[in-house]
Amino acid sequence: LCRSEYKVEKSAREKIALFCNVPSTHVIEGKEVKSIYEVPLVFNQQKLGQLIADRLQLIHSPKIARLEQFLHRFKHPKFEVTIAMCGKYTELPDAYKSVLEAFVHAGVENNARVNIKWIRMEEISNDKKINSVFSDVDGILLLPGFGSRGSEGKILTCKHAREKNIPFLGICLGLQCAVIELS
């Protein structure tokens, strides 16, 4: 596999094959793509699955129609929604990578692009500011976290979502704050 920002030319492919002692058909290009979900299609176009199956003496019949449908809906959504992701560690989006990927998949399944609005709970300190913070969101996700820092903001967020009838999901401490707010 040759990672590259650009298409690997035939001459480069042949040179790599020569020095790696493999047939040039076994030099697979892993060029940059816009989405990680395109990578299996790029490899399938180069028959990587078939090469591996042949080498391992397996029967190979790729089933990529669902991936192609997924990619089409991913690239051409019919709708857009904005979800407020509220938590303590919003300056580190990778802390919530699994949640972000879940939104990608849920969005694709519903023909929608999910835009994220990051909100630090320490910024929510009173009812006056909260209206402007959530004025442009279609839903609120209160993220997990530990400790008391930002708890007041979380409880105010739960109250706002309930009173304004904004779709809401609290995970872990987020759900606990929703129960506290309601009780």
Task: Identify the role of each PLM range.
Residues 1-182:
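N-terminal beta1-alpha1 cap of cysteine-dependent amidohydrolase-like domains
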